[in-house]
């Protein structure tokens, strides 16, 4: 894991600690107990998320996509489900979490990222394109520093710039 303070130095959770220490030599690096994280993750998925739906795609110890379309009659709305998840995770485990709600995985992931460190953001279908286009390039999952630099060299500084480009450009 990388704290929000560490992320300001370009450190991310997938980065090797040796590289992170070069980027932030005065940082405090704590040992990671992955077995504990996996156990907590398993409990949260079993005790909280599975109570909503069985349609869960877990992508890491702390991230998943849920298709809640079959749960709406019982729960009322996606935002009610998201609020309940955040409440239960906080009450049961004293852990904060962010929830992104959208009609597809890409926009849901971007909404969750924008809701960090402890919020919820719902993007209605009619606003998907507008939301994505207002994002900086790095706001798109998969665009890291090197791809961003290449796009910048081509005059692309935002998702809106990217959307305006033709295939011939």
For the regions a protein language model found, what residue spans apply to each?
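Catalytic palm subdomain of template-directed nucleic-acid polymerases
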Residues: 66-86, 115, 155, 167
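Hydrophobic (often cysteine-bearing) scaffold residues that line and stabilize catalytic clefts
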Residues: 37-41, 57, 77-82, 143
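Long, highly charged, low-complexity intrinsically disordered interaction regions
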Residues: 77-138
């Amino acid at each position: 894991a990388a704290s929000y303070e560490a992320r300001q130095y370009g450190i991310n959770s997938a980065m090797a600690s040796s590289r992170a220490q070069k980027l932030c030599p005065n940082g405090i690096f704590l040992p990671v107990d992955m077995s504990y994280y996996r156990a907590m993750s398993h409990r949260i998925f079993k005790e909280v998320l599975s109570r909503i739906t069985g349609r869960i795609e877990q992508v890491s110890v702390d991230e998943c996509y849920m298709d809640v379309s079959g749960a709406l009659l019982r729960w009322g709305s996606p935002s009610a489900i998201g609020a309940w998840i955040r409440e239960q995770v906080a009450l049961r485990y004293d852990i904060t979490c962010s929830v992104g709600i959208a009609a597809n995985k890409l926009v849901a992931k971007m909404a969750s990222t924008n809701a960090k460190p402890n919020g919820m953001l719902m993007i209605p279908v009619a606003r998907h394109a507008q939301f994505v286009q207002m994002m900086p390039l790095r706001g798109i999952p998969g665009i890291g520093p090197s791809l961003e630099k290449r796009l910048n060299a081509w005059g692309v500084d935002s998702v809106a710039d990217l959307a305006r480009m033709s295939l011939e450009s």
